[in-house]
From Swiss-Prot:
Name assigned to this protein: Inositol 2-dehydrogenase
EC numbers: 1.1.1.18
Keywords, alphabetical: NAD, Oxidoreductase
Organism of this sequence: Burkholderia orbicola (strain MC0-3)
Gene name per UniProt: iolG
Catalytic activity: myo-inositol + NAD(+) = scyllo-inosose + NADH + H(+)
Function (record text): Involved in the oxidation of myo-inositol (MI) to 2-keto-myo-inositol (2KMI or 2-inosose).
Length: 337
């Protein structure tokens, strides 16, 4: 069975997913598209040679008889309504982050999915599909380094645009760490604090950069995450886990080691899409396979809610300078196991 997918949102990430659905992945095809800009939808159909209906409204895509699953890559504030509509129609939905722009919105999706009685939602957190993170989790889960005590992490971008704001360091950047570190450790966060080092002169006047986020988990693991979005030298993701008996470190992407002109060097990536391109392929293939097999296994609506609650606390901590509690609702039995 070839899964027939409707895509809502034909911007950069939407077209990137259309490309991989059309040219890279197996078991699915795009049969319907929508974008707030009709020309973008038409351009996507032409560019990728789609045999797809263009709909004027995203909710029409959800309701379309030919659509068996939905891909939501539209503007963030629209995600909640489209995901809820997909659940109401009983259709599996892959939603790019954010699942909703508030934790309350994520909880409404959780409640709707629980009421439906079957997992239909996968959230577009791709790092758990990165082979480096998977290898790191295997080491942690094996017990080889003992119980994790501390994590030292960094999320560095070469530069960001003028529209990037201080809170986006949490909602657009740290959000990936909030998801993947919770997945690595298998436990929720208890508190968050944000501190500000000396500001780089490469940052816009309105932007606090860098920032250091200090997290504590329910069991007491301490995590520090450096967010530095104007580091200049490249795109660099680091994660070191300090355990009771050893240390495990996220591997850097493979690169040719060069010795030349009395120097030794390794190239550093500058594009975040290049760094995680394989992960995007694997996560969407996992969604396709999960739908076809009748069991989704990727990041769930509950994971989207957990990330949103933690992000809200981090934004509060940015403003207060205090240690902010991260208080989540009780996890429904539906999402356990």
């Amino acid at each position: 069975m070839t899964l027939q997918i409707g895509v809502i949102g034909c911007g950069a990430i939407g077209q990137d997913h259309i490309r991989r659905l059309t040219r890279t992945l197996s078991g699915a095809r795009v049969v319907a598209v929508n974008d707030i800009d009709p020309q973008q939808a038409r351009d996507a159909v032409t560019k990728y040679g789609l045999d797809a209906e263009i709909y004027a409204d995203g909710h029409e895509v959800v309701a379309a008889a030919e659509v068996q699953a939905v891909l939501v890559t539209s503007w963030g504030p629209t995600h909640e309504a489209f995901v809820l509509d997909a659940i109401a129609h009983g259709k599996p939905v892959f939603c790019e982050k954010p699942l909703a722009v508030t934790a309350d919105g994520c909880m409404r999706i959780v409640e709707a999915e629980v009421a439906h009685g079957k997992r239909l939602v996968q959230v577009g957190f791709m790092r758990p599909y990165d082979e480096g993170y998977r290898a790191l989790k295997r080491v942690i889960d094996s017990g080889q380094i003992g119980a994790p005590l501390m994590l030292h992490c960094a999320h560095r971008n070469q530069s960001v645009g003028e529209r990037y704001t201080t809170d986006m360091a949490i909602t657009d950047t740290l959000i990936h760490e909030l998801d993947v570190l919770r997945w690595l450790l298998g436990e929720d966060y208890a508190s968050a604090q944000v501190v500000y080092p000396k500001k780089t002169h490469h940052a816009s006047a309105h932007l606090a950069d860098p920032q250091i986020v200090l997290l504590e988990t329910a069991s007491g693991v301490r995590i520090d995450v450096e967010i530095f979005v104007n580091c200049q030298y490249g795109y660099d993701i680091q994660c070191e886990v300090v355990g009771e008996q050893g240390i495990a470190k996220l591997p850097d992407p493979p690169a040719v080691g060069l010795k030349h002109a009395a120097r030794q060097s390794v190239e550093i990536m500058t594009d975040w899409k290049e760094r995680f391109i394989a992960s995007y392929d694997v996560e969407l293939q996992a969604f396709i396979d999960g739908v076809r097999q009748g069991a989704l296994t990727g990041p769930s609506a509950w994971d989207g809610y957990a990330a949103a609650v933690a992000a809200d606390a981090c934004v509060r901590a940015q403003k207060s300078g205090a240690v902010e509690a991260i208080a989540m609702a009780e996890r429904p039995a539906f999402y356990r196991g």
